[in-house]
Amino acid sequence: MPRAFLVKKPCVSTCKRNWSELPDEERGEIYVPVSLGFCPPQPYREPEPSVAEPPSCPLALNMSLRDSSYSMAPGPCVVAQLPSEDMGHLTDPQSRDHGFLRTKMKVTLGDSPSGDLFTCRVCQKAFTYQRMLNRHMKCHNDVKRHLCTYCGKGFNDTFDLKRHVRTHTGVRPYKCSLCDKAFTQRCSLESHLKKIHGVQQKYAYKERRAKLYVCEECGCTSESQEGHVLHLKEHHPDSPLLRKTSKKVAVALQNTVTSLLQGSPHL
C-alpha cells in the first residue's frame, strides 16, 4: 500500500474505523474526519495535558475515568459518517484534537452538484455521483452474470469482462504517442503520460472524451462506429461482434430518422 494512503495521525481513542481506498487512478483524495466505530482496544499511552471534556460516548467512558485529561468531542458515539455541511466544523485544527482520527479517503474527481457524497453501505467507499455508486454496487453481487470464455472467471459488469479478456487476447488499443508503450485502458495511458512524460490532460471532468471503437479480434481502432462496422465486415465477417454492432448501428440509425421526421413535419 502506498505510504500516502496510511493514517497520518495515531489514534488516541480506544477504537477507530478505517475507510477503504478506491483503486481507480482517476480519483482524487480528501481528508475526512472519522468518528468512532468499533475496533480492538489500543495499548494505553500517557496523553499530553489538555482541558478535559466529559465524553458522552459509552465506549470512551472507561478511558475518561482512567485518565482525566482525555478529551473527546461531545455527542453520541456513532459509526463513521460522510462529510457534509454540518460536519464542516470538524475539519478545522481545533477539532482535530478532540478524539477524531483523520484518515485518507479517496473519492472521485469533480464536484457533485449538491456537494454531498454517495456512500456504499457495504464497504463505505464514497462517490460524487449516484451513477458511479450504482455501478460500484455490482461488485458486491454474488452472482457473476458475465463469464470469460477463456478462463471462466465471472464479472458483474461487461466493461470489467472486456478489460479482463484483453489480458488473454493481448489487445492494447491505447498507444502512447511519445513511446512504444500500449495499454488496455485509457486511464492507464493517461497515468503513463502524466508520470513518465509529464503530460497533463486538459479536458474537464464532465467533458466527454472522443470514444475509440476497438476491435476485440485484432485490436484495430476506429474513430467512428461506421468505420468499426466496415472493419468487422471486411476482416471478421464471421465474428459475433459484427451482429451485435450491426444491431446497435441499426437502432442508432432508426432513432436518427425518427428524430428528423418529428422535427420536420413536412418530410
UniProtKB/Swiss-Prot annotation:
First and last residues of each zinc finger (C2H2-type): 118-140, 146-168, 174-197, 213-235
GO MF entry, a single one: DNA-binding transcription factor activity, RNA polymerase II-specific
Tissues showing expression: Expressed in fetal kidney, and also in adult pancreas and placenta. Not expressed in intestine, peripheral blood lymphocytes and ovary.
Transmembrane segments: none
Keyword Transcription regulation: yes
Keywords: DNA-binding, Metal-binding, Nucleus, Repeat, Transcription, Transcription regulation, Zinc, Zinc-finger
Subcellular location: Nucleus
InterPro entries: Ovo-like, Znf_C2H2_sf, Znf_C2H2_type
One Gene Ontology term from the biological process aspect of the record: keratinocyte proliferation
GO CC annotation: nucleus
Pfam family, one: zf-C2H2
PANTHER family: TRANSCRIPTION FACTOR OVO-LIKE 1-RELATED, ZINC FINGER PROTEIN WITH KRAB AND SCAN DOMAINS
Main function: Putative transcription factor. Involved in hair formation and spermatogenesis. May function in the differentiation and/or maintenance of the urogenital system.
Name recorded for this polypeptide: Putative transcription factor Ovo-like 1
